């Protein structure tokens, strides 16, 4: 995505235009790095939670703890899978744009990317919040409702879930930063869309 939105006019200086292009390239490189990190963290989070299983024998009865037992963890896995796939596609687009040196001129496409980033960011925040609340209940219990501390029996399961939530949190922070960058990029297009009129003396 291009973040310049500044056309070359008779009043623009070539040096200034070159400087703006360098700034634009740095922003796009930053976006590429962030999207790659989000993809990695989201994928790790989904794998950690989805593969987390622990079996305990209680009074000769085997009890298995898995992520599907908690709807919040299922939601977290699905959301992080979506975030990883979306970030991978956008990272590839950023890389291709950098290699070709092309800029995004289509405002509808810029808005589509903006709304996509916003949606994924909000979903990531919701997923982490729901999973963190469920994890807190599993760790601390709820004496008033006679909810026991599940993590006292399934320590390994809870530890791996905690690692998954931590990885999802990093992915969430990255998506929030990316959504800010895409918002800046969209509104930057409109900020420089009108050519400057030369003043008359």
From Swiss-Prot:
Keywords associated with the record: Cell membrane, Membrane, Transmembrane, Transmembrane helix
Membrane topology: Multi-pass membrane protein
UniProt topological domain (Extracellular) ranges: 50-71, 130-166
Pfam families: CASP_dom
Protein's name according to its UniProt entry: CASP-like protein 2B2
Subunit structure: Homodimer and heterodimers.
PANTHER family membership: CASP-LIKE PROTEIN 2B1 (PTHR33573:SF64), CASP-LIKE PROTEIN 4A4 (PTHR33573)
Naturally occurring in which organism (per UniProt): Arabidopsis lyrata subsp. lyrata
InterPro entries: CASP/CASPL, CASP_dom
Signal peptide: none
Cell compartments where the protein resides: Cell membrane
GO cellular component: plasma membrane
Family: Belongs to the Casparian strip membrane proteins (CASP) family.
Ranges per topology, Cytoplasmic: 1-28, 93-108, 188-201
Keyword Protein biosynthesis set for record: no
Membrane-crossing residue ranges in chain numbering: 29-49, 72-92, 109-129, 167-187
